[in-house]
């Protein structure tokens, strides 16, 4: 599926999901301009993978994604502070869904994590559990929880959901240690 009208798609050199489009942009180093008819996180992903000589242009700067907007960099930093105060941050490996902002992806990398797509989420979680005891899955709680429970046999009680609108995410230090 795509989010552009057919009148726009007919002029596209490449179509696909966000990760494919970012990889395709990077595979064309001769392209001086990458005009990205998508949303912010998609253009940011392409910009991360392309060379400094390439300019990624997003024609509609108001094009956002509710999934990517589920967690802001500030909220994630606050969550990490809560994990630190609970004494578990050193056991946590962040895993972020491709549909997240460049700031969230940078946070994930800075803290030794990885970025996943819906098709490799299980492999990403398996890798993360090899690195640490706990996972902070961003920004989509459903993909993280469903993968852990349905595909990896974890219990729903093994997963807690941090709510950035509540003090300490609505979680106690004990809940964070037990998750």
Residue ranges and their predicted role:
Residues 2-179:
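The feature marks the mature, well-folded catalytic cores of soluble enzymes
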């Amino acid at each position: 599926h795509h989010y552009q009208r057919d009148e726009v798609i007919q002029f596209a050199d490449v179509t696909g999901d966000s990760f494919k489009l970012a990889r395709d942009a990077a595979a064309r180093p001769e392209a001086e301009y990458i005009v990205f008819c998508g949303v912010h996180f998609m253009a940011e992903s392409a910009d991360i993978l392309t060379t400094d000589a390439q300019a990624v242009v997003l024609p509609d700067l108001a094009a956002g994604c509710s999934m990517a907007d589920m967690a802001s960099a500030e909220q994630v930093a606050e969550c990490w502070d809560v994990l630190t105060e609970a004494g578990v941050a050193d056991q946590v490996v962040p895993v972020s869904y491709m549909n997240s902002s460049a700031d969230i992806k940078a946070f994930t990398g800075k803290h030794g994590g990885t970025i996943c797509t819906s098709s490799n989420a299980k492999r990403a979680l398996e890798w993360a559990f090899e690195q640490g005891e706990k996972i902070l899955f961003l920004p989509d709680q459903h993909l993280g929880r469903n993968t852990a429970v349905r595909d990896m046999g974890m219990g729903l009680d093994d997963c807690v959901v941090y709510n950035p609108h509540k003090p300490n995410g609505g979680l106690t230090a004990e809940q964070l240690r037990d998750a």
